[in-house]
Amino acid sequence: VIWYAEDVHHFAMSMNPDYRYEGGHWGDVAIHVLYQPGDTAAWGGGVAVQRTAKALEWLDGVFGKFAWPQISNVHRIEGGGTEFPMMIHDGSADQGLIVHELGHNYLMGILANNEWREGWLDEGFTSYQTTLFDEANGHFGGAAGDEAFLTGMDLDGTSEPASLQSEYYRDFTSYNISIYSRGEQFFHQLEYLVGGESMHRILRTYYDRWKLKHVDEEAFRDVAEEVSGMDLTGFFAQGLHSTELTDYTIGRKERKKTDSGWSTKVEVVRKSPGRVPVEVWVIGQSDTAAARSVGLAEREWVTVETRSEPKEVLLDPRVRTRDWDMMNNQKKFGFHPLGGRDYDLYLDTYFSTPVHRDEATIGFLPTVWYNDAGGITLGLRSRSDYFGRFEQNQFLVSGGTGWATDEDVLDLDEYVRLRNPVWLRSPGMTQTLDVFNVEGRYGAVLSVERTHRPHLSFGPEREVGLRLRWVVPDDARFLVPGEFEDVGTAELELSAGVRDRQGPWQLGLKGTAGGGLVYNSRGLANATGRNDLDPYFYRATLEGTADRTLSPRWRLGLRGFAGVSAGGDGETAKQRQIYASGADPLERITNPFLRSRGAPLLRPDVYYHMAGGGNLRGYDPTVSMSALVAANLELERTVLDRAQKKLFKRVSLAGFGDAGHAIADEDDPITGRNIEFLADAGAGIRAEHRLGQTSFRHSGRLPVLYQPPRPGSGPAPRRRRVRLPLALQFRSSMVV
């Protein structure tokens, strides 16, 4: 058997004696469809033939007449698609997939592109024309989503240029993103630069001139420059061979009355290396006018004429320049609150945060909780966000009403969080400042963390961090007995960690080390009654986790922990010791449901477990010590899995065991309990849910084995040997 074809540079074949065949044509192009038995409903009855004809009609309109006599659309074994001259292999008969794969026949086959050397000129190009097809049929949003994703990668410093030769990408994931998505964005930006009509003529001229010939970047650029009449050398260099960020802002603005209306001068300021012409819109009282900057200079003046009085100036309102900071692209004339910027204001439902590319959001939420000192506490919280990564700030004002309590402590509290301001942007960095005066405590926490991943889909993810924390208790009526001593603490902590997957195991290791001081203006001994309390302390922890699935329904989790926190000659203040059962008091300080005496999840009849410390889940949360080593084991069996549901997405049964040992034989400084060996084991049931963007779980646990601390001079442990506590969690408290 001999196969013969002219004007092709690739070859493929597919053979299956069980194939079903249907045929048709588009003009003088024969259409052959081969599909697998059992897929008649999806492929047969002319479905795949008609969709292939529709794809040919679309592509002929975009580029020009199909240059070969036939096209074969073959149903392949797995999903996705593959392209060859006069043949496409499709995992389904989806119209968009057929348009994409058949587009390769034009852009890789007829325009003979070397995909190994310049994949963007094939994969990026056909992704672009597929998006045009989707938009022509009323399906929008794909290109905008890709733009936001790619800009995020640029901000994280993980992008690679679209023009690299295939083997030079650091991994297959980066290759796919760069030549498909970044390649597609290049063509969208070219269309923005030259205009839609010129872009259409570029595509048809390029196809007509180079069909059935070998093509490269130079061939396409020459056509684009000839048709548009523009020098595109810089644009091609930036769009294909770099990953430079773009950021323009509005500088000064002036408006004046003219004989025909109003003239507005706008200073366009370039703040990042990326250069692209920027649309400048002036919104008047009854009309809108636009002009375009050159975009090359650091500062450039643009004049816009309107008939009515100008009210507002916008840069790039259509989000076509890939400007990463759109918050500085708007200015209004006159005085306006919030700096003259528009914000998307919404009623916060807690479970979801709207994220926009072109403006920030601010959500408002009334809050209510309870504690024994202030009673029912009412407040108002706002939280903001830009781009899902910047200006993630929170402001909360709350106050106790004295309702439902005999103590009637009226206290106005404030909490402010500033997170990731735009002006501190740095790849992989997260900056957070908390300042608070809440329920008998005031202080501040400043933290900086950097994460780094050499590869996007595999390999280790490393993080390093620095945190400065200052906390002072000032009203003991709010404090949980046995968790605080009457001293302020200030400490500096360094942290480092790594997460990775090795075979079936998801592994993690994190360590912290730091030190600080405890103080009280009345003197430590007078404030605490302890003559042994050293003003200086050191603190270090090391945590390792290992998690794997044993089968589709079984999962095993392991955790090891070691921690030490002590003064120069012995124990440090209670609030900075190592806690046996979970998170320590300072880790819980931002959660009003876990913060103060009598809080909803900190009552004697409710047990909420917030992971941390030794994770000895059967113990009273006030049990602490200077040094502890602990191990946790968990075996989980899924009994119900409904991934598409919102409530009870997954229900599982779990058995757990925890063991810990105090490194030094010591007594708890407040309760007097002697602490040495601790252990617990039990079983529980978990249910996982998802509301909005938030996944959470609740669980009930039954400790069946429990080793209490040895009796001392203080009160007995709160936990009894057998108990069914309620644990409601908005984050996982599993050991890993």
Regions found by a protein language model. Give the residues of each.
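Zinc-dependent metallopeptidase catalytic helix centered on the HExxH motif
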Residues: 86-146, 203
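Beta-strand-rich binding/interaction modules
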Residues: 232-233, 246-317
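Acidic/His/Gly-enriched intrinsically disordered linker/tail segments
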Residues: 6, 117-194, 210-211, 215, ...
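Outer-membrane beta-barrel initiation region
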Residues: 294, 304-305, 316-427, 431-432, ...
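Hydrophobic helix-coil surface modules that form long, contiguous segments used
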Residues: 1-99, 128
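C-terminal outer-membrane beta-barrel translocator/porin domains of Gram-negative envelope proteins
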Residues: 366-368, 428-439, 445-449, 461-468, ...
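Strand-connecting loop/turn motifs
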Residues: 196, 231, 359, 388-390, ...
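Amphipathic alpha-helical substructures
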Residues: 176-264
